[in-house]
Amino acid sequence: MLNAHRYNEKTASISRIDFTILGNKEIKYTSALGKNTPGLLKYEFYDNTEPQKGGLIDQRMGVTSNDLECRTCGLDSNFCPGHSGHITLAQPVFHLGYFEHVISILKCVCTKCSKLLVYKNEEDIIELLKSKKGKNRLNEIKNLVKSISYCQKANYGCGNPVPKIKAEKKKATIEINIVAEYAPLNQNQNQNPTDEIDKKPIKEILTPMIVYNILKNISDRDCLILGIDPTKSRPEDMIHTEFFVPPNPVRPSVRADFMSSGPREDHLTIKLADILKANQRLAKHMESDDKNLIEYFQDHVAYLQYHVATYYDNESLKLPQSEQKGVMTKSLVSRLKGKEGRIRNNLMGNQTLWERV
């Protein structure tokens, strides 16, 4: 039995609750699969009739049947709360829940040197730090940088032009991108500045890897000005490099009837299998020496990004809906929102047993 988690009857007082980003390091550290492992590697659910070790219903993440014991805590399904796992991604991908926040931060920093675009010693900034916090502070910084066109060298910047940051979702190619649009440069002095070619902005695709590195290089001081406490969360944690796998009791297997050939898996488990397959395909592609495959690299990244996005939200995104045998898969957002969701239907119900929540 793996001694990753042990429960006892000792109690302790709760001093406070901090709502922070579930970072990549924390996802790996709290995983029942081990923080020094690549996480789940097998998308098969069963080995003969037993849950596949290293698969998506690995018994180290909890059990959903009374005749089984959890391989982490040793408890049965009545008492085991379940334990989270993780998938180490071959390439970073965007977390759609933080997508707009990432765009807001990118508008406030240089895309080349990650420096904040405003002067840190301005009176406006000093007053801002005193009066605004969190999201309100970030919105104020966004307003201050609207008129800045270059990363100012006097502010220890690099002098790079400041682009317009936009989101781009392509339904035909299932791509989700962040685009940096730079003002057109007239390189030919003899060319008429009214020509059509001069009016086209210069576009740069900011891939999740590029965005991850930009956010990672933002200093702790700049994070504080942006309303982020770097001792609790870092901006790069809004980009997935490790993917959180919820415990088995959150997505239990269901046996339809005694005549069925086997258990029916939850929609979240099916989507996790899609993510795992896309991730393994991308990893094999990256290990290949075939130069002809290079052009398909971004397609594999986009495919992984698509399955991660539809895992969270399979309805409101401007993307093709993910389906399983002709039925739309139920995403994480679908479980939470609406009158039939977990919050209004379960947690706010009159018969909720709050000590179990």
Task: Give residue spans per PLM region.
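Conserved core architecture of multi-subunit DNA-directed RNA polymerases
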Residues: 1-357
